[in-house]
A protein has these predicted regions:
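Nucleotidyltransferase catalytic core that binds NTPs
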Residues: 1-194
Length: 194
């Protein structure tokens, strides 16, 4: 089971590509939009209801992908460490993998990765959890920087970010090439990130 957590603020085509690719590696991909985070003010830019609607529009019909909106429904933020226990309880016979970007593990050899330095119980997770590391084009992670139990997920031509999409919307520019049609229609109808 792959846990694909993130703010998905908004969910872009790059997120959908990652989820689709993960279905080739894992039996089930669970998209987990995070709740409000004290360390990420951009998550507060739109309501939880809008984020939930967009995540369901983006991932709802994807084969092998399910959306878990626990954090959004409960108005909480569940740390990765706690997600492990939550999903291990839901799927006691499954091996749980956490999806992260290569930038998050960079510096791992020297214990300087974001997981080591910023995540709750990061050094422990680094040694004990399974990580599926998504490699963006042009961004290579040295083998020594990878977590103890990890698997690389290589994606060619993966471009886009939530920040970029939000900035385009703020500037009144088109996001047609960065989000799926359903999400784009929702963004425009609701006039989000303007």
């Amino acid at each position: 089971v792959a846990i694909f957590g993130g703010s998905f603020n908004p969910p872009g085509l790059h997120h959908q590509r990652i989820a689709a690719e993960l279905t080739r590696y894992f039996d089930r991909v669970i998209v987990v939009p995070c709740g409000l985070r004290p360390d990420k003010a951009s998550v507060d830019e739109v309501t939880i209801e809008h984020r939930k609607a967009m995540v369901n529009l983006a991932f709802g019909g994807m084969s092998g992908v399910v959306v878990d909106t626990h954090d959004l429904d409960q108005g909480v933020y569940t740390r990765t460490y706690d997600l492990q226990a939550m999903f291990q309880d839901k799927f006691p016979n499954a091996v749980i993998w956490h999806v992260v970007g290569g930038d998050i593990v960079s510096g791992g050899r020297a214990e300087l990765s974001e997981i080591h330095t910023r995540w709750y119980r990061g050094p422990e997770m680094w040694q004990e959890f399974n990580f599926a590391v998504v490699m963006r084009p042009g961004y290579q992670v040295e083998a020594g920087d990878m977590p103890a139990c990890s698997q690389s997920v290589e994606l060619d031509h993966l471009f886009g970010s939530g920040t970029m999409i939000r900035n385009l919307l703020k500037e009144g520019q088109s996001v047609t090439e960065w989000v799926c049609p359903k999400v784009e229609a929702y963004l425009l109808e609701q006039q989000l990130y303007r």
